[in-house]
C-alpha cells in the first residue's frame, strides 16, 4: 500500500491524538501517503479529507481530544452512506484505513472491510468496554481524572461530614468506577455488572459513622443508576446528608497519561504494519505487555468478563 487514511470516530478519548500521530509518522516512515479524515465516518461520506505530514502531528502527543475531530455517523449505517464513502475512497485512491474508536467505530471498520477496503480497528474509548483487549486508549487517563475528583470531593465531604455519590461514565461496563473506586479508596462501588443494593450501601455508611468516619465516598457507574435519585434515597434512609456529583464529560478531557500515550503509539504503529502487509479486517489491542491483533469478527463476538476478583477486593478494603 502507498496511500492510507486515518480517522477517529464516536466519543473522543485522551490518547487519540497520540494514535493519530503514530499512524501518520509510521506511514510516512514507510513512504506512504497518509490522509486525515475529519469528523469520523462522516468525513468519508463528505470527502472531508486532507493529506497529513510530519508537521500535521507535531506537538499533539500531549493533547486531549482529537485533531481530526469526531462524530457518530448515522448516515454511514445506511447503504447510501456506504456507497458515497466507497466512492470517495476510490476517487482519492485510498488503499487502506485505520479507524480509531469504540465498539461502533470497530463495527464501522468491519463494514469498510466488507466493502473491500482493508481497515484496521484501534480501540479508543474511555469505557474500556472492548472485550478483546485488556485496555483501551483513554481508559487510564479517565480513571486518573476520576481519582483526582475523588480526592477533592473527599476534602469537602470530610469538612461537612457528608456522604458523596460520584457518578462516572459506564453504561454497560463498570471498569472506570471499579478501578477509580479502588485507587480512590471509595467506601462503596456500584457497577451495572453487579447491580445495586441500597440497603447494603446504607448499612455500610452507618457502620462507618458509628466508628467515627467523617466522610463516605460512593462511586456509581451511570449504567447502574442515578446519583441524584440515589443520594435522596440514602439520605432518607440514613439521615446522613448526601450530595451527588456527576462528572460527565470531564472524564473525556485532559492531557493523556504516559500509559495512554504509550499504548496509543504502539497500537497506531501496529495498525500501519498490518496495512503495509496488505492485511485488513483486523483489530489491534494489548494482552498484558504484548500488542496483539485479531480478526474483527472474532473480536466483536467476545463478551466482556467483569473483574469480579478486583470488585471483591474493594469490598474487603472498604470495611
UniProtKB/Swiss-Prot annotation:
The active site is at residue 127. ADP binds at residues 21-25, 154, 185-187, 211, 213-215. Its EC number is 2.7.1.11. Its cofactor is Mg(2+). GO terms for biological process: canonical glycolysis; fructose 1,6-bisphosphate metabolic process; fructose 6-phosphate metabolic process. Mg(2+) binds at residue 103. Allosterically activated by ADP and other diphosphonucleosides, and allosterically inhibited by phosphoenolpyruvate. It catalyses: beta-D-fructose 6-phosphate + ATP = beta-D-fructose 1,6-bisphosphate + ADP + H(+). ATP binds at residues 11, 72-73, 102-105. Its main location: cytoplasm. InterPro entries: ATP_PFK, ATP_PFK_prok-type, PFKA_ATP_prok, Phosphofructokinase_CS, Phosphofructokinase_dom, PKF_sf. Keywords: Allosteric enzyme, ATP-binding, Cytoplasm, Glycolysis, Kinase, Magnesium, Metal-binding, Nucleotide-binding, Transferase. Substrate binds at residues 125-127, 162, 169-171, 222, 243, 249-252. GO terms for molecular function: 6-phosphofructokinase activity; AMP binding; ATP binding; fructose-6-phosphate binding; identical protein binding; metal ion binding; monosaccharide binding. Pathway: Carbohydrate degradation; glycolysis; D-glyceraldehyde 3-phosphate and glycerone phosphate from D-glucose: step 3/4. It is found in: Cytoplasm. One of its GO terms (cellular component) is 6-phosphofructokinase complex. Homotetramer. Belongs to the phosphofructokinase type A (PFKA) family. ATP-dependent PFK group I subfamily. Prokaryotic clade 'B1' sub-subfamily. Catalyzes the phosphorylation of D-fructose 6-phosphate to fructose 1,6-bisphosphate by ATP, the first committing step of glycolysis. This is ATP-dependent 6-phosphofructokinase. It comes from Alkaliphilus oremlandii (strain OhILAs). The lineage of its organism: Bacteria, Bacillati, Bacillota, Clostridia, Peptostreptococcales. The gene is pfkA.
Amino acid at each position: 500500500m502507498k496511500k492510507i487514511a486515518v480517522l477517529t470516530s464516536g466519543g473522543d478519548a485522551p490518547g487519540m491524538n497520540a494514535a493519530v500521530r503514530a499512524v501518520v509518522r509510521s506511514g510516512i516512515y514507510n513512504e506512504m501517503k497518509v490522509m486525515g479524515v475529519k469528523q469520523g465516518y462522516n468525513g468519508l461520506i463528505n470527502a472531508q479529507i486532507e493529506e497529513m505530514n510530519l508537521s500535521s502531528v507535531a506537538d499533539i502527543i500531549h493533547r486531549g481530544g482529537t485533531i481530526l475531530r469526531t462524530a457518530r455517523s448515522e448516515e454511514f449505517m445506511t447503504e447510501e452512506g456506504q456507497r458515497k464513502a466507497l466512492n470517495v475512497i476510490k476517487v482519492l485512491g485510498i488503499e487502506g484505513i485505520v479507524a480509531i474508536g469504540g465498539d461502533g467505530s470497530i463495527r464501522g471498520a468491519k463494514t469498510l472491510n466488507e466493502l473491500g477496503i482493508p481497515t484496521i480497528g484501534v480501540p479508543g474509548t474511555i469505557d474500556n468496554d472492548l472485550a478483546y483487549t485488556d485496555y483501551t486508549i483513554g481508559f487510564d487517563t479517565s480513571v486518573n481524572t476520576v481519582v483526582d475528583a475523588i480526592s477533592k470531593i473527599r476534602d469537602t465531604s470530610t469538612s461537612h461530614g457528608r456522604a458523596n455519590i460520584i457518578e462516572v461514565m459506564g453504561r454497560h461496563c463498570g471498569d472506570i468506577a471499579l478501578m477509580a473506586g479502588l485507587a480512590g479508596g471509595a467506601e462503596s462501588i456500584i457497577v451495572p455488572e453487579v447491580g445495586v443494593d441500597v440497603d447494603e450501601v446504607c448499612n455500610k455508611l452507618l457502620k462507618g459513622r458509628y466508628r467515627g468516619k467523617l466522610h463516605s465516598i460512593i462511586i456509581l457507574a451511570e449504567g447502574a443508576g442515578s446519583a441524584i435519585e440515589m443520594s435522596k434515597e440514602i439520605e432518607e434512609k440514613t439521615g446522613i446528608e448526601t450530595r451527588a456529583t456527576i462528572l460527565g464529560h470531564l472524564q473525556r478531557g485532559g492531557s493523556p497519561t504516559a500509559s495512554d500515550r504509550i499504548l496509543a503509539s504502539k497500537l497506531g504503529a501496529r495498525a500501519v504494519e498490518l496495512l503495509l502487509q496488505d492485511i485488513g479486517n483486523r483489530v489491534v489491542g494489548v494482552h498484558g505487555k504484548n500488542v496483539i491483533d485479531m480478526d474483527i469478527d472474532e473480536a466483536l463476538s467476545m463478551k466482556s468478563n467483569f473483574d469480579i476478583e478486583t470488585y471483591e477486593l474493594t469490598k474487603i478494603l472498604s470495611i
